[in-house]
Amino acid sequence: MWASAALLFFLQSADYTTEGLKALDAAKYDQAADLFGKAVAADPKDYAAHFHLALSYTMLKRDADSLAEYKKVLELKPGLYEAELNAGILLIRDKEPADAVPYLQQAVDQKPKEFRPKLYWAQALLDSGDLAKAEQQYRAALDLDAKSAAAELGLAHALAKQDRLADAVPHFRAAAQLDPNYRDGLLELAGLFEKNHQNAEAIAIYQEFPENAAAQEHVGQLLLESKHSADAIAPLEAAMQKDPTAANRLALATAYLFEKQFAKALPLLDQSVAAEPGNYSLHMMYGRGLRDSKKYDPAAQQFFQATKLKPDSREAWNELAGMLYMLEKFPESLGALDRAHQLGDDTPANYYFHAITYDKLRALKPALDYYREFLARSKGEFPDEEWKARQRAKLLDRELSKR
């Protein structure tokens, strides 16, 4: 990656130079840095020694020292192509692309037909936000090397960041076709489709990666979001088998719940709750799964745990009230309904459930009052319950009038 010049003839100390170059070739970078440091000390104006010292520091990832040496080289020998190029690459590596731009532009100006400086200049422009110019330079790089996967992917990024996703697609594809190592760029493209709410396009790409658990998880999640829970099950099962993370387990459980496959969903939810006992949403989800499979006692336990975690949740108190009612624990159910009402639940449903629960307890007067309040508030919203409420209200009124 790094440019190297045949600068041996510029060195003042043959011994330091010879041994330093041998150390560089043998990847003994500490030794090379020491030797070239001595050469620089012997002749501070020897730009070739400074260059090789910079290169040694680069290999040691002593980037600040390396950059200082490249700057010294350019001070002693302005416009040295190899130093311009290496300094620019180094600044890109250190995530200072704006500072890299002038070095790389000068390298391109010196050798406009060279592919590498043009590619790195394009990357520096892209990373520093000059998207239109980055696009221009990536296209110029591809004119010099049409088989560069790196240039294709860079051009794809430049286009995508300009909100030209449709234009970017063929370049993501080209990069993947030119070099299998760039195939993960397609996953990036799928993520961009997701952000753009193009779920069908994202799913199609993720499905090209059947062995990638994360990709299959995304397929399942997108299908769930698109209300295609049945189609989501297979990819989520595959993702769970390859990578049994908490997220994959929950997504698969969700798909099973939507498809009413409670026997498969409930064990997964039990594991999820055990792994995160302080997660309110998981207790609510597990409770509803148990409720829908008519397992009212364990459902009530989950909703009770939810009320402990979030005591101000009207939703949790209402769910708990419903399960206690089904378990014929009517006084406890009333207590939960009262708590939901205290928290602001003034809906017709709350009055209706109060009414039927008091009715079960044969508390006729409060039952009648709640039926009447429900009817006053419902106003046709719940026709079936309104019919039942009217019938019960008539009967209760008669019974009370006989007393």
Language-model features and meaning:
Residues 13-14, 47-48, 81-82, 115-116, ...:
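Helix-start (N-cap) detector for alpha-helical repeat units in TPR-like alpha-solenoids
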Residues 42, 76, 110, 144, ...:
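Structural marker of alpha-solenoid helical repeat scaffolds
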Residues 25-26, 59-60, 93-94, 127-128, ...:
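Register position in tetratricopeptide repeats
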Residues 38-39, 72-73, 106-107, 140-141, ...:
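Canonical positions in the second alpha-helix
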Residues 6-52, 59-61, 68, 401-403:
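N-terminal leader/linker segments that initiate helical-solenoid repeat arrays
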